[in-house]
Amino acid sequence: KRQVLLKDFDKNGFVFYTNLKSDKSKAIKNSSKISMCFHWKSLQRQIRVIGIASKVSKKEADEYYKSRAYGSRIGAWASQQSSILKKRDDLYKSIKEFKKKFPDQKKVPRPEYWSGWRIKPKEIEFWLDGQNRIHERLKYIKKTKSWKKVLLSP
């Protein structure tokens, strides 16, 4: 299970970006069938998406990367996501080194190991909290050209 920041969605799916050497990317490479969940405790609602993940195009990754703040682009170079740090100062030193390497804020290239994943949904389930645990659950299942709607028992 991994937490990600949803950055885009359209008719082709849901998109998030990450380090391709991260644990989540390794898990996706091992099995492209994945799920994601949006939970709104205060609204008593949840949406679960099950689908197939594929990498976004280099062009799409480049476009999004260029839209990020300078510090975030430097961070993509400086941080080896999920690796063990001996001390936090090592990370700050790496950030400083990459700021020297890429002083022009408009010319920070996207690292090859940084890209995005698109989740093409096959199923989407909507859960609405109900009194006495009699929840409402609606599931949409992707067919060739349409979605089939089914009502699930709580």
For the regions a protein language model found, what residue spans apply to each?
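Binding-site signature for planar aromatic cofactors or substrates
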Residues: 1-154
